[in-house]
């Protein structure tokens, strides 16, 4: 009998082992769909981004006009831009749900997979930030100024670092040029890191909602989960096209319809919605360096998750106390997101400070303590 080409061909063999004959736990739920959704988001962003880059000019005098030209005069340019801008929002929705799933079901105990995932998140955040600067609207310019300026809080080398990043003494043409170069490069770095992420995942196999080993009950990925993934793709694209066609500017800032002007500061500088929770944590500390450290800690704290797991059970499926804390954390993140979009005045300042404090308290103190307490309860 002739060997099956998909199992013997050097390249097809890799695809086969990752997407066709991959042994998968039979009980994984829709929460395990987000990995493939992130993959399709990345491919969509690279494709639409490439088409946009063909019509974009990375120059402070022409950037705003070139984006306007793309929307007005290029065939379906408006659609490509709307898909790209809203695709970024869906990318972040998927990655936040993916991380939430990881925390709820204890997936962080696969340390290598988890750590590469956090590096992917940081790279995605950097990509989204430099991309937001490219249309060169008011919020693009002032967002770039405020966020890059945070590096000046680093002792001794801070100011030099900022001027080196800017390529001058303020955000100007060199900044825009290098941000465009970075925005073009980073998605390919994300694609490379994704392969590393998957390599580590396939070393251990997928986790499942029960958190117990599933080697005795695995089924092939295709056709069972490939069909489930395709349903996910259809729902994602339905959501994306609905957003891009019916309310493309829903998640954007009206300030960005005004060309960048270094002489006029917008009344309220804020990043895109997906960074608002971190922005609220940054602003909740009145000291510049303290704020920057809190901002970094809000994401880097995820690296500590495997070490803060004190429960004998992997997932939260049968841990009601931890579940309550998890949903409290989710609610807390919504509050932080809302606070980040509000001006710095009473009562938003104190709400932001309390929400920031509770964010770190839940992750660093309450979840590990609850895990240990639930172990004790198991003995009764």
From Swiss-Prot:
Originating organism: Phalcoboenus australis (Striated caracara)
PANTHER family the record matches: CYTOCHROME B
Keyword Acetylation: no
Chain's role: Component of the ubiquinol-cytochrome c reductase complex (complex III or cytochrome b-c1 complex) that is part of the mitochondrial respiratory chain. The b-c1 complex mediates electron transfer from ubiquinol to cytochrome c. Contributes to the generation of a proton gradient across the mitochondrial membrane that is then used for ATP synthesis.
Cofactor, free-text remark: Binds 2 heme b groups non-covalently.
Amino-acid positions noted as binding heme b b562 in the UniProt annotation, renumbered to this chain: 84, 183
TM annotation in the entry: 34-54, 78-99, 114-134, 179-199, 227-247, 289-309, 321-341, 348-368
One Gene Ontology term from the biological process aspect of the record: mitochondrial electron transport, ubiquinol to cytochrome c
Subunit structure: The cytochrome bc1 complex contains 11 subunits: 3 respiratory subunits (MT-CYB, CYC1 and UQCRFS1), 2 core proteins (UQCRC1 and UQCRC2) and 6 low-molecular weight proteins (UQCRH/QCR6, UQCRB/QCR7, UQCRQ/QCR8, UQCR10/QCR9, UQCR11/QCR10 and a cleavage product of UQCRFS1). This cytochrome bc1 complex then forms a dimer.
Encoding gene (name): MT-CYB
Keywords: Electron transport, Heme, Iron, Membrane, Metal-binding, Mitochondrion, Mitochondrion inner membrane, Respiratory chain, Transmembrane, Transmembrane helix, Transport, Ubiquinone
Binding-site positions, heme b b566: 98, 197
Identification of the protein by name: Cytochrome b
Note: Heme 1 (or BL or b562) is low-potential and absorbs at about 562 nm, and heme 2 (or BH or b566) is high-potential and absorbs at about 566 nm.
């Amino acid at each position: 009998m002739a060997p099956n080409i998909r199992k013997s061909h050097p390249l097809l063999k890799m695809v086969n082992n990752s997407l066709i004959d991959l042994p998968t736990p039979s009980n994984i739920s829709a929460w395990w769909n987000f990995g493939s959704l992130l993959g399709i988001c990345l491919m969509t962003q690279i494709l639409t981004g490439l088409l946009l880059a063909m019509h974009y000019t990375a120059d402070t005098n022409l950037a705003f006009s070139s984006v306007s030209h793309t929307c007005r005069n290029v065939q379906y340019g408006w659609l490509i831009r709307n898909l790209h801008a809203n695709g970024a929002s869906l990318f972040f929705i998927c990655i936040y749900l993916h991380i939430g799933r990881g925390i709820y079901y204890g997936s962080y105990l696969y340390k290598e997979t988890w750590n590469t995932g956090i590096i992917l998140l940081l790279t995605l955040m950097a990509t989204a930030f430099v991309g937001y600067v490219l249309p060169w609207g008011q919020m693009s310019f002032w967002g770039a100024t405020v966020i890059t300026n945070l590096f000046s809080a680093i002792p001794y080398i801070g100011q030099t670092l900022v001027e080196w990043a800017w390529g001058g003494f303020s955000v100007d043409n060199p900044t825009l040029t290098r941000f465009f170069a970075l925005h073009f490069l980073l998605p390919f770095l994300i694609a490379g890191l994704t392969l590393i992420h998957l390599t580590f995942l396939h070393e251990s196999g997928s986790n499942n909602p029960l958190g117990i080993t599933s080697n005795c009950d695995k089924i092939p990925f295709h056709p069972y989960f490939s069909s489930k993934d395709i349903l996910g793709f259809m729902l994602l694209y339905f959501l994306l096209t609905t957003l891009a066609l019916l309310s493309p500017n829903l998640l954007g800032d009206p300030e960005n319809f005004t060309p960048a002007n270094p002489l006029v500061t917008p009344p309220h500088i804020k990043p895109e919605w997906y960074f608002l929770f971190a922005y609220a944590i940054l602003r909740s500390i009145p000291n510049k360096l303290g704020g920057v450290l809190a901002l970094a800690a809000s994401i880097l704290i995820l690296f500590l998750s495997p070490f803060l797991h004190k429960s004998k059970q992997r997932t939260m499926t049968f841990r009601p106390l931890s579940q309550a804390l998890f949903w409290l954390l989710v609610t807390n993140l919504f509050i932080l997101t809302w606070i980040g979009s509000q001006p710095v005045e009473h009562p938003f300042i104190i709400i932001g400070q309390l929400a920031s404090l509770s964010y770190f308290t839940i992750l660093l103190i309450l979840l590990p303590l609850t895990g240990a307490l639930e172990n004790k309860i198991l003995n009764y």
